[in-house]
């Protein structure tokens, strides 16, 4: 039998550089496995307000 999907959770990623620049923040949603990745996720994603790739960190 297949295992359940209780280890995957939906998280929100928010741009860190947009707050410093004074423009609206960009947010992305994704999933992560909370068993394998216990610390907060940091990914490089595109911010359409800044028109460049920036660091996005996981928020609560």
Curated annotation (Swiss-Prot):
Top-rank taxon, per record: Bacteria
Pfam annotation, one family: Ribosomal_L33
Keywords assigned: Ribonucleoprotein, Ribosomal protein
Any one GO MF annotation of this record: structural constituent of ribosome
Gene Ontology biological process: translation
InterPro entries noted in UniProt: Ribosomal_bL33, Ribosomal_bL33_sf, Ribosomal_zn-bd
One GO CC annotation: cytoplasm
UniProt-listed PANTHER family: 50S RIBOSOMAL PROTEIN L33, CHLOROPLASTIC, LARGE RIBOSOMAL SUBUNIT PROTEIN BL33C
Family: Belongs to the bacterial ribosomal protein bL33 family.
Protein's recorded name: Large ribosomal subunit protein bL33
Taxon lineage: Bacteria, Pseudomonadati, Chlorobiota, Chlorobiia, Chlorobiales
Originating gene: rpmG
């Amino acid at each position: 039998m297949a295992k359940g999907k209780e280890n995957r959770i939906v998280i929100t990623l928010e741009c860190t550089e947009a707050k410093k620049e004074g423009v609206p923040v960009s947010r992305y949603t994704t999933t992560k496995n909370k068993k394998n990745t216990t610390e907060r996720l940091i990914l490089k994603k595109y911010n359409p307000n800044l028109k460049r790739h920036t660091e996005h960190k996981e928020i609560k």
